[in-house]
Amino acid sequence: MTDNTDMEKLDRATTPTPIPNEAPPTSEPSESKPEEAEDESKYPHGLKLAAIILSNMVAMFLVALDRTIIATAIPRITDDFNALGDISWYASAYLITSSATQLLWGRIFTFYPTKTVYLVAIFFFELGSLLCGVAPNSVAFIIGRAIAGAGSAGIYSGSTILITTVTPLSKRAGYVGMMGAVFGIASVIAPLIGGAFTDHVTWRWCFYINLPVGGAAVACLILLFPKFPVNEPVSVKQQIKQLDPWGNLVFLPGVICLILALQWGGEKYAWDSGRIVALLVLACVLLLVFIGIQIWQQENATVPPRLFKIRNVWLGTIFAFCLGSVLIVFLIALPIWFQGIRGTDAITSGIDTLPLVLSLVFGAIVSGGVINGVGWFNPVFFSSVIFMSVGGGLITTFVVDTPTRTWIGYQIILGLGIGQGMQLASLGTQVAVKQSDVPTGVSLMFFAQSLGGSVLVCVAQAVFNNELRSRLTSFDGIDVARIIGTGATQLRHVIPADRLAEVLVEYNAALRSYFYVGLAAACFAVLPSLGIEWKNVKGQEFVH
């Protein structure tokens, strides 16, 4: 898609002056027109590049670890703090600040040096981890989780932004794929590490571990990350204006209300309760006001509206939303199937999902290598949605006695699809926008991916509960409410032994409706993948 001359002039006339950051190249070609081969001599090479990338991977590893390491530590934490009622906040505090600050970090990365902002994000993450480790009570622990969540959002998007700063476009896909692989590996081993610390040392080491490892990464980045030319500084007033304070003033509480409604709805409170309805209404109002402010602010907006005139941006946002939905829905539903239908415990069900996660890692690495080799990322989009749709569809055929080789194979197919697509929306955005817009574009993709998982998993849970209720109401002597409120691992303890087999058949059928929501998201992802603009990243520098 190519903007006309008048629009290009308008963009240049209305673009705010950046404050100290890596100075973007002076040329601004049209969105679709490639230039000559990129000069790779300006980027770090050899051991220096390897050390920077390794430090970046370590930071991403810690963030991924922190997301799930707490799962096996929560029982011991609640024992120490005598705060069983706070369990939901241990996850919610992290998720709320991570989601709410994602776009703000993108804006900060746009106007300040990548190195400085990335180190600040790591600082917040480390500070939150330290507070969690030394927390004397549950309130302090929750505050620490909130601070760490805010820092994790900056690291999550910053890790990709850092790669765009130190690597040429032609080699970027491989490094981005490696980041996806690191995230997958950390997600697999996090519960195991958390369990080991909790059982053999103390749960506090789940958070202390971030300090020395993260500190080493920080030292490496401080010493080795290259210096780039910076633009002339502007006034403090202009800096504040460029960070869109009015937009963030309504966006942050809007996202907080939405996440709380999604976290509490159907669990702590009924969906039609006054609290949930009020939160949803308030979230809608605040987010609509945010959209209005973005249109009003234009270039000073958190997400400049002109970005949505670029096909790869708005289609990439939809694709990222779908991908995040598929990932989270199946990551939650599969352990429920293993625990509820096959009768495994929580740890064993985690091991049983290894085929999905390991194939996801493999898919992320291979897709990066393929894009580096051939230059085109569009075929990988197609491959991703095909594998996701086929794998998701096959998983919906699970029955009570599905053999081991079958559920392993189906997970591998799904994992390959998700892994291939993990970083595609981000990469498609990078080649379609100006270099100065890359931080905003990348943060937007990650926000959409996170939001997709949060929204669709609630939809899937509601569909599952309704389906299960409708299937079990005709069973005499069965307490439907108790079954729905019971965790999957305890399912066999609340069902009479003589009715277990027939109830499991209905439970499996209801759980397939959970899978259908993930399958629907995978199939819908076909549409944006078909519309993504064809661009060859090999040996060319596109838009700056």
From Swiss-Prot:
Residues 17-27 have a biased composition (Pro residues). It holds the Pfam family MFS_1. Glycans are attached at N300. Residues 1-42 are annotated as: Disordered. Induction: Expression is regulated by the aurofusarin biosynthesis cluster-specific transcription factor aurR1/GIP2. Disruption phenotype: Leads to pink mycelia in young cultures which turn red in older cultures, suggesting a delayed production of aurofusarin. Pathway: Pigment biosynthesis. The chain crosses the membrane at residues 45-65, 89-111, 116-136, 146-166, 177-197, 205-225, 246-266, 276-296, 318-338, 357-377, 380-400, 407-427, 444-464, 514-534. It is a multi-pass membrane protein. GO terms for molecular function: transmembrane transporter activity. Residues 1-12, 30-42 have a biased composition (Basic and acidic residues). It is found in: Cell membrane. The keyword Cell membrane applies. GO terms for cellular component: plasma membrane. Keywords: Cell membrane, Glycoprotein, Membrane, Transmembrane, Transmembrane helix, Transport. Belongs to the major facilitator superfamily. TCR/Tet family. Rubrofusarin-specific efflux pump; part of the gene cluster that mediates the biosynthesis of aurofusarin, a red mycelium pigment which is acting as a mycotoxin. The first step is performed by the polyketide synthase which condenses one acetyl-CoA and 6 malonyl-CoA units to form the first intermediate, the cyclic heptaketide and yellow pigment YWA1. The C2 hydroxyl group in the pyrone ring of YWA1 is probably formed during ring closure by an aldol-type cyclization reaction. This is Rubrofusarin-specific efflux pump aurT. It comes from Gibberella zeae (strain ATCC MYA-4620 / CBS 123657 / FGSC 9075 / NRRL 31084 / PH-1). The gene is aurT.
